[in-house]
Amino acid sequence: GQNSTYYGKAEDLVLSQEYITPVGDIRTVDVPAYATGPNIDQMMIGSEGAFGILVAVTLKVFRHQPENTTRFSFIFPDWPRACAAAREITQGEFGLPSVFRLSDPEETDVAFKLYGVEGTPIDSIVSLRGFKKGERCLMLGTVDGDRAYTSMVKRRLKRVCRAHGGMYSTGLITKKWEHGRFTDPYMREDLQDYGVLIDTLECATNWDDLPKVHEHVRAFIKSRPKTVCMTHMSHCYPQGANLYFIFIAKMDAEEFHEFHQGILDAVQSSGATMSHHHGIGKMTAPWLEGQIGKNELEVFRALKRHFDPKNVLNPGGTLALDLPDDDRRLP
């Protein structure tokens, strides 16, 4: 989830699993590592109920030390310098933040309103420093772990961010973000009552290609008049990061479906992955073969034939396993 930059994604936390499948039970062992052929855990993770029903899982656990958690936020003059700072942080090998989120200019302007920054002394200082609306970018996050570790990582974060033109804006913005982190999404239901639709699509790419992906996908979304497009990264690695594209616009269901497909086409043509962690499901299935390749998709289908020869588990297009050829959207 939101702490994956330090702890890893959900699949990185799995030690063992147990599934019930039409051909029998599948169990793996809860040891930290093994080398006994291809990893069955990884074969099953992400299968979205198409290979079996997950009935038990053993996960890694970590020490809970909230008293040591330290918060930070920085404002950058623009997106390129903010991305350069994020890249240097993840590649610095001095430790990683737990929550690590970087918003592009449009999302930053919305965040200043949502988190109560607009009109505060922080906002005034940012403006005096020449950080302009429509250009400035907000980075926020937390560091978890031993007290000495969290203090050291925060010091290094400050050093890197300042070297890229970032201004430290305290941990107060992060606290504001935490306060609304799990309630803000519920605005979607209220807005739908007025015909305003919100959706989130996410992808992943490497650092060199990230600016191109951001520009390409955002350009398509903004080509529709009166459409808000907020973008952020929140799962970062030494090699690259994910990008979340959140769009808000007034449209009906038919127009939404067509627009949504266009965004996925833009993600595919940008060279990014079709998903970083949301999964493929049925909605994104038409793009899967174009993402991973025909031979690679046949591996999934071979596993499906083994575990579920009668196709009773989650049929109807999940993972493109029984998707009609005419429904494929290839690059």
Give the positions of each predicted feature:
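FAD-binding subdomain of flavoenzyme oxidoreductases
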Residues: 1-101, 329-331
